[in-house]
């Protein structure tokens, strides 16, 4: 896994322009009508969050080959989710659970406000469509408070097909595109 020797790797243009446009519209529309899907786990803000969304689970499946190329590993997809962050949102410093052994966090789009992610103390600013592949269980990652209006981010998670966490395939769900 030399490709992730620092624990992370920036992948420019992880999403195409068409994927950015599609996911921007999709996440903003779902956010506007959301009344039930909020996450208080990694942020104090209670931002819109969708686990196992069919759109991002499909993206995770379609980006597996790219992730294998970027990491040098054979990967099994586990789950995806996306969040729409708002003013004063943050991401608490943490490491991930076993189903997030190899992950990529991807900036879909935002209001334009800068909001870096920190990987093991290194500040990384992503442009729309860029991603950071990282060893989710090994490297601490976080974000400070967001000072913009909106920021759409997706997270695609995988495990090493030949590693100790392969039991987490599909995050132990019977199908992709559903919650547990």
Language-model features, listed with the residues they occupy:
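Non-heme Fe(II)/2-oxoglutarate
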Residues: 1-71
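A structural signal for short, well-ordered beta-strand segments and their strand-loop junctions
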Residues: 10-11, 76-77, 133-134, 155
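Alpha-helix initiation and capping sites
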Residues: 17, 57-61, 76, 94-99
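Generic beta-strand or strand-like secondary-structure segments
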Residues: 62-66, 81, 103
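Catalytic core of non-heme Fe(II) oxygenases with the double-stranded beta-helix
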Residues: 86-142, 150-154, 159-174
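Charged phosphate-binding loop/patch that engages nucleotide di/tri-phosphates or the phosphate backbone
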Residues: 174-180
């Amino acid at each position: 896994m030399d490709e992730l020797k620092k624990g992370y790797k920036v992948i420019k243009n992880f999403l195409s322009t068409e994927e950015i446009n599609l996911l921007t519209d999709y996440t903003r529309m779902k956010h506007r009508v959301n009344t039930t899907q909020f996450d208080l786990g990694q942020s104090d803000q209670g931002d819109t969050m969708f686990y196992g969304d069919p759109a991002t689970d499909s993206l995770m499946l379609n980006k597996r080959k790219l992730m294998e190329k970027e990491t040098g590993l054979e990967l099994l997809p586990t789950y995806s989710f996306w969040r729409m962050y708002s003013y004063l949102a943050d991401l608490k410093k943490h490491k991930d659970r076993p189903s997030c052994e190899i992950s990529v966090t991807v900036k879909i789009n935002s209001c334009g406000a800068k909001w870096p992610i920190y990987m093991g103390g290194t500040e990384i600013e992503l442009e729309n469509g860029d991603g950071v592949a990282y060893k989710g269980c090994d490297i601490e990652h976080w974000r400070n408070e967001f000072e913009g209006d909106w920021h759409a981010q997706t997270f695609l998670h995988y495990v090493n097909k030949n590693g100790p966490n392969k039991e987490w395939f599909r995050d132990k769900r019977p199908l992709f595109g559903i919650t547990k």
